[in-house]
């Protein structure tokens, strides 16, 4: 019997459940690339009996669909956690280390201990849990896809919320990404306190 797309997304988790793993955690990040704002990470343990239809890599979903799925994932999850690392720390330790730190914090803040962690991309250094890295995991793993939605929506909401503090920069429109408009604003006004200075060296004379 051919699996549906939703069932295919759970194939990795199904194999792990059959191997005896109970609490399977997916973890993913949002906001590696922007010129401003924190990097976010989410960790989530989903319930096998409550598969949510339509879960995909967050980048393939409309904002409206992401928002709807965000609420469903929170409601149906066994446990979830969201963490962020701000722009100052990103500048201090670099974006790769900041991303790993956000992921590690999200996992460690879960209300339960996962039996195994599925990571999108590469293994998290010094993580005290069994983990498997899955390249393009947000396209292959249901748990990672759920985490990608939680991370993306959480970051977008945060950026929209703080945008009122920095009205000149129009963060609510571009979410901190390096759009033409954002770069023109940067060249006119310079960076604000939430910009990642280490990301701006090729854009501004810093």
Swiss-Prot record:
The organism's place on the tree of life at top rank: Bacteria
GO BP annotation list: DNA replication, removal of RNA primer; mismatch repair
Enzyme class: hydrolase
Keywords associated with the record: Cytoplasm, Endonuclease, Hydrolase, Manganese, Metal-binding, Nuclease
Subcellular location: Cytoplasm
Cofactor(s) required, per the database record: Mn(2+); Mg(2+)
Keyword Manganese on entry: yes
Record field: catalytic activity: Endonucleolytic cleavage to 5'-phosphomonoester
Details of cofactor binding: Manganese or magnesium. Binds 1 divalent metal ion per monomer in the absence of substrate. May bind a second metal ion after substrate binding.
Entry EC number(s): 3.1.26.4
InterPro entries found in the cross-reference section: RNase_HII (IPR022898), RNase_HII/HIII (IPR001352), RNase_HII/HIII_dom (IPR024567), RNaseH-like_sf (IPR012337), RNaseH_sf (IPR036397)
Record-linked Pfam families: RNase_HII (PF01351)
GO MF term (any one): manganese ion binding
Binding site for a divalent metal cation: 28-29, 120
Record-linked PROSITE patterns: RNASE_H_2 (PS51975)
Gene3D superfamilies: Ribonuclease H-like superfamily/Ribonuclease H (3.30.420.10)
Domain spans labelled RNase H type-2: 22-206
GO CC, one annotated term: ribonuclease H2 complex
Similarity-based family: Belongs to the RNase HII family.
NCBIfam families in the cross-refs: PRK00015.1-1, PRK00015.1-3
Record's function text: Endonuclease that specifically degrades the RNA of RNA-DNA hybrids.
Protein name: Ribonuclease HII
Organism classification: Bacteria, Bacillati, Bacillota, Bacillota incertae sedis, Caldicellulosiruptorales
């Amino acid at each position: 019997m051919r699996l549906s797309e939703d069932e295919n997304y759970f194939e990795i988790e199904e194999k792990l459940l059959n191997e005896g793993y109970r609490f399977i955690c997916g973890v993913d990040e949002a906001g590696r690339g922007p010129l401003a704002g924190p990097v976010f990470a989410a960790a989530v343990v989903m319930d096998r009996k409550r598969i949510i239809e339509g879960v995909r890599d967050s980048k393939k979903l409309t904002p409206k669909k992401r928002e709807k799925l965000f609420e469903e994932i929170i409601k149906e999850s066994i446990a979830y956690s969201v963490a962020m690392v701000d722009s100052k720390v990103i500048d201090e330790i670099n974006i790769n280390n900041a991303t790993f730190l956000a992921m590690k914090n999200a996992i460690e803040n879960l209300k339960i201990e996962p039996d195994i962690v599925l990571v999108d991309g590469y293994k998290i250094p010094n993580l005290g849990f069994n983990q498997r890295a899955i390249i393009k995991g947000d396209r292959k793993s249901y748990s990672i896809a759920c985490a990608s939605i939680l991370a993306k929506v959480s970051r977008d909401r945060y950026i929209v919320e703080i945008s009122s503090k920095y009205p000149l920069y129009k963060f609510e429109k571009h979410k901190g990404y390096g759009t033409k408009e954002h770069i023109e604003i940067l060249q006119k006004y310079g960076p604000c306190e939430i910009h990642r200075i280490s990301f701006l060296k090729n854009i501004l004379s810093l």
